[in-house]
Amino acid sequence: MKICVLQPDYSTTKVDYQYYDPPRQLAHLWPDAQIDNVFLNKLTTYRQLKELGKKGYDIFVNLCEGYLEWEVPGVDVYYSMELLNLPYTGPGTKLYDVPKELMKYVAYCQGVKIPAYIVIESMDDVKKAAQKLNFPVFVKPEKAGDSLGVDRHSLVYNEEQLASKVSGIIEEYGPLLAEEYIAGREFTVLVAGNAENEKTCTVFRPVEYLFPEGYEFKTYSLKTSELHPDCNVPCRDKYLDRELRKAAEKIFLGFGGAGYARMDFRVNDKNEIHFLEVNFTCSVFYTDGYEGSADFVLKFDPIGQSGFLKHIVAEGIARHQRKMKPFVIKGNAISGFGIYANRDLRAGEFIFSGEEKAQRLVTLRHVEKNWSEDDKETFRRYAYPISKEVFLIWDNDPTEWAPQNHSCDPNSAYNGLNVVTLRPIAKGEELTLDYATFLDKNMQPFHCLCGAPNCRGLIMGMPNNSVTEREARLKKVRVPRQR
C-alpha cells in the first residue's frame, strides 16, 4: 500500500490554529505501508496534487482542514483531488463545511432530538430570538467548527447578554446560531463509512467529556490551547452507549455520509439525547498531548488509531472505485461517438447505476407544450420512458453523457434503471444496447447499420414499453392498459 498523507503548510498565514496543529506522523500506524508526508501550500495546492497524482499512490489521506476564511489549504484540496480524479479519505467538497442549520434539519428528519434554535443574520434578529427561545441560550457561528467564536460569554441568560454576544462576533463569524442550552452531560461520537457497503457505517465507542472546574461547555481554547486529556472518559452507560450510536448512525447515513465524522451530543437530566453538531473534517491522529476528541474515541475503542487508518483508507479506495466509469467515450465528427470498455468486464457488471441516482424527469405534456421542434426530435431519439407520460432525459452536465449506440446483438441491457453487461466484454470493445428493448412508440424509428447477423433493419420502439410496464411484468402483476 502506497499512501500520501496531506497536511497544511502554514507559511501563508498567521492564523493561531497553526500552533495547535503539529505535523502528524502516521508511518508507525501501518509499518507495512509506504507512507509519505506532503505539506500543501495554499498557493500551489492544485499544482502539487497534479504532480503527486503521477506517483502511483493508492490513496491520499487528507488532513487539511482549513476554513474558507483562512489562508490555509481546506476545501480546495478536495476540489482539486476531485478535478484530478484522485482517491482520498474524508468527505469531499459536498460535506466539507456543512451549515449548522442543515445539520439540525437532517438530525430532525432522522428522528433525533435537537435544541430549539434561531439563525441570527443581523442585530435585528436578536429580539426575535429572545422572544422565541427559552433562556439560557447558547450562541455560536452558524458555520465554523472547532468552537471558533465560542468563549465563556457564549452562554447568555437574557436579551441584553444575547445582544452583547451577537454584536461582538457577528461581523467576523455571522450568520450565527442561537439555540436553547441543554444543561447536562456532553458526549462525542466518531463514525466512519464502510468500504464494503456505502449504505452502512461503523460507530465507535462514545466518549464523555467531563468539564474542568469553571466550564459548562467547550470553548475554542478548550479545543486548542487548554486541552484536558483526563476529562475524556469512555461511556460506560450501556443505554446511552447504544442510543448515542444509533443517533450518530442515523445522522451520518442521513447525510449520505462518506469518509468519517465526529458528532457532539448533550444528555439532559431526563436522559434525553440532543444532537448539537457534526464535523465531517474532524481532526485525528494526534499524539503527545495534542489529542482531540476523535483520538480519545480511538483510544478507548478496540480499533485504535492504526485500525481506524486502515478502515478509512479502505473506504476511500472503495468509494473511488465505485465512481469510476467502466468505459471511455471515443469517436469523431465523421463516424460519430460511442462508449468502449476501459477494462475487461464480467457478465452482469454495471455500466450505469441509475437506481437511487438523481436524474432529470419530464412529462410528455410538458415537452409537447414547451419544447422546440428540434428539442422534440432529440426527445424522440433519446428519452427513456418511465411510464406512458413520464420520461427520463439526458443530464444537464455533458460530462455525464454517454453516447451508447444501438446494436441488434447488444452486449448490455437495461435492468430497471441500471445498465448491465449481458456477457463478458473485453477491454476496448464497444458497449451497445438494443434501443427497441427500452424505448416506446414515441421513439424516432431509424435504419440500423450494426452489421449483426440478426440485424432487423428498421428499429422501432414498442408500445407500452416503459419501466413501469416492465417492472410490473417482472412481478407478474397485470397493469390495466392506459388509453
What are these regions (language model features)?
Residues 324-411:
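Catalytic cores of histone-lysine modification enzymes
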Residues 1-7, 52-54, 97-177, 184, ...:
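Active-site nucleotide/adenylate-binding loops and adjacent lid/helix of ATP-dependent enzymes
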Residues 155, 338, 344, 423-426:
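Residue-level "contact hotspot" at macromolecular interaction interfaces
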Residues 158-239, 243-246, 267-274:
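Phosphate-binding site of ATP-dependent enzymes
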Residues 406-483:
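C-terminal SET catalytic tail plus cysteine-rich post-SET Zn-binding segment of SAM-dependent SET-domain
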